[in-house]
Amino acid sequence: PKNSMRGRNNNGHITSRNMSGGGHKKMYRLVDFYRKKFDVPGTVERIEYDPNRSCYIMLIKFDDGTHFYYLAPQKIKVGDVVENGSAKEIKVGNCMPLRDIPVGVNVHNVELQPGGGGKIARSAGTSVTISGLDGNYSLVKMTSGEVRKIDSRCMATIGVLSNPDQKNIKIGKAGRSRWLGRR
């Protein structure tokens, strides 16, 4: 678990005030935002809660025996097969370059530089829409309405992220905020 010092030094004295502290201990799950396992199909083994992020994560077992955690999109279920790489089927959970994704499809975990790992649309219920192609670039419409020009070799995952109702959760009391490590 990640150590939560929150403004205290090794003697326990406050060295930086106004930092939130405490909260329930969290085990960090290593989520793969790069999705570099190309052309090997993988099966969704389970979908899990992750205390470190707002959306759910899925454990994928690839045919060569390796396991990875990925962000779980909506409408994916245990037993579904997902693949990474170019010219694959346009199916929820598949990851491919922006140039291979048709216009109007919702995607998440979008890279900003080829091979840089997903940076855009990683929070619960979010996605961006492919709105067009411009030479070697893809036009991507963000949830804010902004249209960004991103290199077409950048990878993105098909689908909208899970847990869209996360924004409607009521904290209810001050103590629950403290459980979450917020002040």
Task: Say what each PLM segment does.
Residues 1-53, 78-183:
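Basic, glycine/proline-rich low-complexity segments that contact nucleic acids
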Residues 51-58, 67-70:
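Short, flexible active-site-proximal loops enriched in glycine and acidic residues
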Residues 61-68, 86-92:
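Short, structured beta-strand/loop micro-motifs enriched in basic residues and often containing a Trp
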Residues 65-77:
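Beta-strand/loop nucleic-acid-binding surfaces
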